[in-house]
């Protein structure tokens, strides 16, 4: 029977795992048995103040564990742990009277304890455990719509499978909004804004109407987010502001241009700094880093990534550590540090996923799709996409084919492994759905991958009949993203490449090499931060120069091809190097 209600055990377990320490190791350092410490972590034994002090010292918790331990001979509620935003709101819920009596005393204390334990579980990645605590808080607050709304907001912060909609949570959010109807207090107004922001994001999670909740698809979610942002007061509560900006940015991610998304992220970072919440600070830093990358501001993103690394170290959050490592791997792939990326992707991330999946119940698809995307891109960069079809990775890609970006990626893999006819068939099926893509967000990397397929088919030759009808559509869809932007796959997973280069290879396939060269000149700005990307760009430039023709074009093309070949050799990009050597061996071919 669980007797611990203050979150000490959950926080102890989270910090121990974050420190990379086994249960036996910690037990030895704090002079108690492994079995007793296990029961403390599971909430079946109450820790003494002395044990809490020892654990705090060994794990360098800076008083956080001692603060959670009950004083000797008392059952006092410990001081709050800042495990996430909303702690202030959880401690100041003003409940309406219930049967003539205010909902205070033990009910209020238990509600706060359950929310705090849920926050600790959430930070540790224990999503099912967090849901259990939040659900208990919700049920215990029956008759108190404001408290129940706070509990449902916490539930809505949990990670969920990408591209899928949580229909039960949608119903809970709508139910809380209905219950607050008629409550004219300032607190209720803030809760309504937060609930609507989460509702908007959850509606927008669907990648298409096929995975949406009835008629409430992603476009409806984006519209609700826009309306909610419009009603957000400039001088309102910072917690409400942080929550609304966080959720509404995600809800509108696929429906607003990357520069507009960066503006929202910067507003969130300012609000999070005022709120001084570790949860929102992490959300803000990751949002800013993502949008800086999408806007081609690589060096600014490097600075933000450094801040996020410090945040992950300070909070000891398992989820923050996962996001920090995936962001590091993304940057390793961009800069050509393929060995470092491979160590994370094929070794460390697998351990991390198994740990989180087995012990913490994080939605596995959220983790596996991120790893899958990074594994795919590493294989592509190294010219090893054939391994995709000899491992279980191809099956994983096919299982996620409801995401168009995976269908586009599979078509590209087929083309780059010599299966051009099969790749063309899959490509045409994917292009048939382009009109259903949102205007931004995940649509951009999908379109860039489709442009890469066009380039592969164009270089192979013999596919003019397949390409001619679809090139205008692809060019029109990518045109709004031309410039210095970079297509970012995932949230974040990989940088697929400059959008201007994708526009250029489409122009080249359409028989407009001069236009292609203009696009390639724009693509050079974001590509300068990545030697592997520069090598790909020079190959594309060489092909365009040859097609333009004229005096000096062939020597210029040869120079570009040799530069691309040197870059490919330096970074072990065997497929790219083979393409360069093939074109060098056939003067005039483009």
Map each language-model feature to its residues.
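Alpha-helix N-cap/N′ positions at the starts of helices
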Residues: 4-8, 32, 106-113, 132, ...
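Helix-coil-helix junctions within alpha-helical repeat/solenoid scaffolds
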Residues: 177, 303-311, 315, 325-590
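Short, conserved structural micro-motifs that define repeat-unit consensus positions
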Residues: 9-12, 22-23, 288, 414
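Internal alpha-solenoid helical repeat scaffolds
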Residues: 82-334, 340-354, 360-367, 443, ...
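Short amphipathic recognition helices of helix-turn-helix/homeodomain-type DNA-binding modules
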Residues: 1-6, 11, 28-31, 35, ...
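Short linear X-Pro dipeptides
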Residues: 4, 10-18, 119, 126
